[in-house]
Amino acid sequence: MSFHPNAVDAPPSYLHQHQAGSPLYTQNTIRPNANSTDLNSPHKPPILQPWLGLQARLFLAPISIPLISLLFVAARMLSSSNEATDSISSAKGKLLSACSAAEGTASLAASFPHFLAASTNVQLALSVTATVHSAARVFDLSMTAIQKILTYIVNSYKSLFMCFMELLVRGALAVLITAVEFISQAITAATLGIRSAIQESITGVNTLLATAVGAINDVIGVFGQHVNPPHIAVPSLTSLENITLPHEIQDGLVKLNATLPTLQQLKQSMDALIETPFEEMKREVNATLASFQFNHSVFPVPEMQNVTFCDRIDTSPLDELGNALKNVARWGLVALLLIAIVVMLIGVAWEWWKWQKEVKAVERTRSLWLAQRSSAHSDGNDKFCDNILKTENLMSLLTISQHPLISFCSLNYCKRLGIRTRRAQDRCAWLLSFLMHPASLACLFTGVLGLISVLMQAILVHSLSHHYVSSIDTSLAHLSSDIVNLVHDHTRNASVAFSTSANTVILQVEAELNDHVFRWVDTTTSTMNSTLNQFVDGLTETLTSTFGGTPFNAPLQTFVQCILGQKVQGIEKALTWIHENAYVNFSVVPADVLMLRPEQQEAVLRPVREAMLGSRDDQGGGNGVVGHVISRYMEHLHQEKILFTALIGVYAIILLIGLLAVLYATLAERRMHDDDETRKKVSRDESEEKLRSDLQAGPGGAGIARLWSRRPKLNAGCFRAFSHPPVPVSAQNPSSKIDHAARFPSSAHSSRPDPIHVTKDSISYPFQMHHSLNTSPSTRPTQPTPLQQTSNPDRDTVQSLHHASTTHNQTASTRTKEYDSWLCFLASYHDGEATVPAKAPEAVEGAQDRFHRLFGCSLRASPTVATFNHHVSAPAVSSDRAEIEVEDARFRETLDLGSMQDWIGSKSPIPPPAGRGGSHSPRNTADQLPEVQLTRSGGCVGPHSSDSTQETYAFTDSVRLPPGPQPQQKRVVSSQSISFFAW
């Protein structure tokens, strides 16, 4: 096997997909070319570059988005401070104007007696006049009623007495006369009856005696006795027939009936006694009271009052509140200034760090690009350069260079979330870049800082408001209490003075009425009492003179006292009450007549209190003086909060738009990926069908098909016949950084079409076989050939013990330029490509690990392991790239196979020489073909070695030679060579 230095690339992937490179700045181990332009070039650069350098960036670093946000918030805070000053001035003016209005209101309240006195005096005068007129009318009606009642009573009782006495006397007399006559007749009849009764009784007694004596005679007649009955003589009694009543009784009654009085004289005298005083009294009352008028001008009128108290207002709490609000804004500005200084320092440090990262990223990107471009040009792969200079790659490079922190955060974020695909990482990076755009950050920083400042100001204002509200409220509460007391004193003094004067006038009028008008009532009632007494006395005298000495005198006196005496006593009591209450008693004016009640005072002084104190709310504010200041300041803060909240809302909208864009991109790429997979699957099926057709249609196609169908399976058991233990893998350089995702597609791999995958026994072999290739089946047991080292330093020579086989391998006349793959890594027919400058090799992965990673199985110990495990082949390093250290170097090497020789359990794809005409000698038959042995024919070239000796591996026969120098022959490049990657 010989080294072929025309391909440098990463090992191929077993997945059928395009290999995506990681961000360019991760390639941090490749140094730039010495001939390229560098920032540290010894040539003196111009003073001003077309881009901003470190000094310019450090100069502009303080002017950052957070600083602008802080300045905006500071401007709003300064505006709030000015607003607080204006609010304090406005509050003072409002307080003074409210105090002036309160003085006017208090003066008006204190002058209420002056305004109330005029109307009160008129009303008092009218009430007194109406009272007097009403009293006169009542007295007139009362006197008339009493007069008529007395007259009616007198007439009634007079007629009653006359009729009753006539009825009584005349009826009694008639009864007596009739009674006398009946008594006389009764007495006469009685006497006659008595006479007859007596006579009949005596006759009966005589009869009884005769009967009794006869009975006795009958009894005693037996004895012969005989008694004579006694006999009583019957008297005549003639005197009883002439008994009668005396005639004087009847004569006296008849005489009394003829002499009864008529009481006409008593009636006339009583009428004269009743009508005369009543008529006189009514005439006097009407003449005096009917024309009575009370003059209201005699009542006093209090003077107007002027109340002043504004000079007692203490506005120092307002000044203290204004100073406190200014201090809040001042300390807020100081805090913002300190934060701004910190932000400026952080901005300077950030710009310096970003500059360093950007410079390093540019250097690493340039070095990597130059190295990859040289490799691509050496392989003739211009498409690789085009991929590097694509707009997407350049934009990614600029973004990563300008925003290293965003890229760092994006990578860490993806790493923690387990995001491994490149497109998902790109979407995360795009979202962070979208959210970290200066416009978005300006909205976010300004909104957050503004809300924090508004919140802090609101907390401080609330804490200050409770203290100063209580202070100013206490001061104004004392002032309002003084105002209330002052108004109360003024109104009380005015009311007392007014009531005293008014009562004096009212009492004077009352005395005049009682002395000049109602004294006649006293006279009239006394006269009426005398009249009634005279009437009763006259009636008694009349009855005494009439019935004196008769049995009717006492009953009539009792009757008159019962019927008339009680009524007269009641009338006398009424007249006595009138006499005792016949006077005017006007109500005097109270001392608080012009004073307001407590609820009226509160209603009048409420505007004054509210103008000073305002209506308090639960948060310490209100519409008072302090409440006005606090409310204006809080209203200003509320407007700022709305502004800053709107800015945060704008950032939230930006976030939502970014998430929607990422979601849309994810769904769209997933749909596109599914479509690509479908198309690739269809294309792969078609290619496989075409491959099978080509393999069957070409020369010897049937034999190839049969050979492929009967080819033994690849497994690790073919290496078990060798007991050589594997050589340990060389240690890796601890300073080297491996990033497989950062490797670009190989030039050889990217220049040929997509490989075709043919699945064979669970191992995928990407390859392209020329239709002229033909293999024959082999029935020999397949074993790997041990790898031996040769001493020939020439890498273009091949050592073999069987000259027929080596001659056969060197005299192949057919030469193809098709790129074909063998096994599972990028292999092609060696076509004598131009060499490329060598890269410094670095042991990265051992043969066993590499084999396990490529083929999915472990490598058994074999003779080839001991020589292959430590083999590092490298081309000679050119002088112009001697100082370039390449990490993870890969080199293409060449495998020379003879026709129909074994290789990893299968036959070589190299067809027999065309000159043999398809006939096979016994040496080349399946039963006689020797195994191929891979030997080393050169030394290892290190990255800094000046030795030009190189190593070459070649297949030899199964029979080993004794140790020592072996004959070698010059390797002839032929179509029977397969190039593959080794590292």
From Swiss-Prot:
Q: Which residues cross the membrane?
A: 58-78, 160-180, 333-353, 441-461, 642-662
Is the keyword Lipid metabolism in the record? Answer: no
Q: Where is the composition biased (Low complexity)?
A: 775-792
Q: Where is the composition biased (Polar residues)?
A: 798-813, 945-955, 967-976
Q: How does the protein associate with the membrane?
A: Multi-pass membrane protein
Q: Which residues lie on this side of the membrane: Cytoplasmic?
A: 79-159, 354-440, 663-983
Q: Where is this region: Disordered?
A: 674-704, 729-813, 902-976
Which stretches are Extracellular in the membrane topology? 1-57, 181-332, 462-641
> InterPro entries of this UniProt entry?
PRM1
Biological process GO annotation list? plasma membrane fusion involved in cytogamy
For this UniProt record, the keywords arranged alphabetically read as follows:
Cell membrane, Conjugation, Glycoprotein, Membrane, Transmembrane, Transmembrane helix
- Any single GO CC term annotated in Swiss-Prot or TrEMBL for this entry: plasma membrane
Compartments, record wording: Cell membrane
Q: Which residues are glycosylated?
A: 35, 242, 257, 286, 295, 306, 493, 529, 585
- Principal location class: membrane
Q: Bias category Basic and acidic residues: which stretches?
A: 674-693, 751-760
Purpose: Involved in cell fusion during mating by stabilizing the plasma membrane fusion event.
Q: Which family does it belong to?
A: Belongs to the PRM1 family.
Query: What name appears for this protein in its UniProt entry?
Result: Plasma membrane fusion protein PRM1
Q: Which organism is it from?
A: Mycosarcoma maydis (Corn smut fungus)
Q: Which gene codes for it?
A: PRM1
